[in-house]
Amino acid sequence: MREEDTVCVGSDGLQYCKVCGEAKEAFFPEGGFMGMKKHSRQCACDRKAYEEEQKYFKDKEHRELVSRNTSICFDESRMEEWTFENADMSDAVMHKAKSYVDNWEEMKRNHIGCLFWGPVGTGKSFIAGCIANELLKQEVMVKMTNFNTIIDDIFPLADKTEYINALASYQLLIIDDLGVERNSEYALGIIFSVIDRRIRSGRPLIITTNLPLKEIKNETMLDKRRIYDRILEMCTSMYVGGTSKREVIASMKMEKAKTLLNTNRGEEDCE
């Protein structure tokens, strides 16, 4: 639409918006300014257009930041689908995980982390991923990794301290599957350094593990006990039980395969 179609000149000589009726010009105080008697101003339509433009760029910047942080957070793209929207929110632990996010500022201020423990396949990693994705939406810097990856990444580095400090710098660090990594003296030394540096940073830590809590609390091996004591010092333990979700999925796939195979067999018999 042309400007002349939306603007008219009032009896006072000022331009007015035909849509909202507000003036698009205003007079300078008496005497004018550098020989000019009037200056431009935003009408309601202009202000609305400006606000919409600012919102567009702010939303675009937010989406790009979240996308960038998400790619840094996860090693596998499938983890991006681990969200509360895709979860069974009637589950008690899942509800607590959502409460953790809802109270993130307080959790962060009080350095409160979580230890999700329980049998294999019950959804501990999924719960941690839901927390990560929800906080990523809030522009929180999160890193979700495991000690096998950390040990592999750190092994060839001359300056291991820089890598460990980088892990400590994330607003939330999630270590998945504690206990599946190698038990060598070198590996345990790296694990302790990462955990200890994280705790000294004062930033929250979330751990998932298949190890029984009793085993964690009663560990007799000195190197492991030092690690577990530091974790229990910072993390609230939550048991994640129930039927193995992996077994349920595998069973569903098996039933689907049987159905398809039987269907195909029936078609062959009819030929």
Regions found by a protein language model. Name each.
Residues R109-N110, Q138, L167-S169, R200-G202:
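Short loop/turn elements that form and flank the Walker-type P-loop nucleotide-binding site
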Residues S90-I112:
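A short, well-structured juxtamembrane/interface segment
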Residues M94-V101, W117, A132-L172, R182-G189:
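Short glycine-rich substrate-engagement loop in P-loop NTPases that contacts/grips substrate
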Residues M1-M94, V248-E271:
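A short, basic N-terminal segment
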Residues D177-L178:
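Walker B catalytic acidic pair
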